[in-house]
Regions:
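Loop/turn elements at helix/coil->beta-strand transitions in domains of secreted/extracellular proteins
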Residues: 53-56, 109-112, 132-135, 164-166
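A bilobed periplasmic-binding-protein/Venus flytrap-type ligand-binding module shared by bacterial periplasmic
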Residues: 30-35, 149-162
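Short, flexible turn/loop "capping" segments at secondary-structure junctions
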Residues: 21-23, 145-149
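Small-molecule pocket liners
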Residues: 25-28, 70-71, 135-137, 150-154
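Short amphipathic alpha-helical coupling segments at ligand-binding clamshell hinges
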Residues: 81, 85, 151-152, 161-171
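A ligand-binding cleft/hinge motif common to bilobed small-molecule-binding domains
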Residues: 113-134
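Short beta-strand/turn micro-motifs at beta-sheet edges
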Residues: 17, 139-145
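Extracytoplasmic ligand-binding site segments that recognize negatively charged/polar headgroups
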Residues: 1-111
Length: 171
């Protein structure tokens, strides 16, 4: 309903108003400042395809979050640039299972940096910080495929038999 939509600033909700964002996750480059300086950070996610990044960065490519990043790259850079990046990625990156594992490896100095969702570091920092104390986050700039933000949203189906309950849940 309109009251629920008004809780979210206009620039962060769809104009048609059929759903609303509930949570957002940013793609970031987590890095270990003891291994890499701010001046050495990749300016773009696309930079990780360059030879100087071989063996220095990690990701968890089997997750839906990473697949969404590739979809964003397709939309922003096109099929050929995405294919070229994926081929270089296969050569350059170290695969880990899960964003937490990537962050832990960066924290331990096993790898210089990695592509993860931002909240993995924030959750760890809110607890002991044990798996992120040696890390920092770098946010890629606007219009870069690495500046991907994933939204979890909700809406009430027109065919719903429980519209009031669904609306209350979303509020």
């Amino acid at each position: 309903d309109a009251a629920t939509l008004q809780q979210v600033p206009a620039q962060y909700r769809p104009q048609h108003g059929r759903w609303i964002g509930i949570a957002a996750r940013s793609t970031v480059f987590v890095y270990n400042p003891a291994k890499i300086s701010e001046a050495q950070l990749p300016h773009s996610l696309m930079d990780l395809a360059k030879p100087e990044w071989k063996g220095r960065w990690a990701a968890s490519p089997s997750g839906a979050d990473f697949q969404a990043i590739v979809s964003a790259m397709l939309a922003l850079k096109g099929e050929q640039a995405t294919l070229d990046w994926l081929k270089a990625m296969k050569t350059n990156f170290v695969a880990y299972k899960g964003n937490s594992t990537v962050m832990k490896a960066v924290n331990a100095g096993q790898i210089d940096g990695g592509v993860i969702y931002h909240y993995y570091r924030f959750v760890d920092q809110s607890k002991t910080g044990e798996n992120s104390k040696n890390t920092q986050l770098y946010y890629f700039k606007h219009q870069d495929p690495g500046a991907f933000v994933s939204i979890s949203g909700g809406g009430v189906l027109a065919s719903s038999k429980h519209k009031a309950q669904a609306q209350a849940f979303i509020k």
